[in-house]
């Protein structure tokens, strides 16, 4: 028996009759077995979102052959699509400032095999976490940033992304506002964790804002970056119940776990091809 290999096909396109039939028919013709199929038909937008995890016998140049032949199906239905091997690790560059809990969580999950990622570097505007990062055998890049040096620092970040081949950038409590230019360059391939349940309490010190309002839940939001501060399409959110006895620092401590969980979920779903961007929204086929 030949070795079995698995692939994941993701697509979105205008809704219409026969799309799913065309996709499954393609898989049947190539003797592929569907392991998981998830779809969402957004009736209001008139758009279909589809993710198929399928398996079959290995063959030389199989992925290229599948891509070449599926392109004909895709063209017929005006599909925006991607086909890749399942389990292929996504190259990730992490950016961080002073707070290290999200960084530690991502590095541990990578090391334990919980996340399908390869961290190709960590960049920070502070030198604090060099020893932690290098313990994992990962390159640490200290890129100081100030108002005067921001254009030069952001150019260095873009160069680092290019040099490392990073496919995804993760802002793991990176406490610098990206310029419109950098945010535009990274649109759709950068995930930020905001320590608030957006759209509430944007900007700095959201836990202090939450305490002033007497909230009964605090949370965290992982979202794609765009040119608007904390306004990018939301991927994942987590909440923690609190009460009137929690002070601002208690809320900060309570929120850290939710930040780690929301960010790791967002990274996982992105790397598994479960997140679809459409306008300022996402569809997540979990």
Curated annotation (Swiss-Prot):
Keyword Hydrolase part of the UniProt annotation: yes
Catalytic activity as recorded in UniProt: (6R)-10-formyltetrahydrofolate + H2O = (6S)-5,6,7,8-tetrahydrofolate + formate + H(+)
InterPro entries attached to this UniProt entry: ACT-like_dom_sf (IPR045865), ACT_dom (IPR002912), Formyl-FH4-Hydrolase_C (IPR041729), Formyl_transf_N (IPR002376), Formyl_transf_N_sf (IPR036477), PurU (IPR004810), PurU_ACT (IPR044074)
UniProt entry keywords in alphabetical sequence: Hydrolase, One-carbon metabolism, Purine biosynthesis
Pathway per the UniProt entry: Purine metabolism; IMP biosynthesis via de novo pathway; formate from 10-formyl-5,6,7,8-tetrahydrofolate: step 1/1
Sequence ranges assigned to domain ACT in this UniProt record: 8-88
GO annotation (BP), single: 'de novo' IMP biosynthetic process
Name of one Pfam family that matches: Formyl_trans_N
EC class (word): hydrolase
Domain of life where this protein originates: Bacteria
Residues annotated as the enzyme's active site: 230
EC number: 3.5.1.10
A GO MF term: formyltetrahydrofolate deformylase activity
Family indicated by similarity: Belongs to the PurU family.
NCBIfam families noted in UniProt: PRK06027.1, PurU
Function: Catalyzes the hydrolysis of 10-formyltetrahydrofolate (formyl-FH4) to formate and tetrahydrofolate (FH4).
Protein name per Swiss-Prot or TrEMBL: Formyltetrahydrofolate deformylase
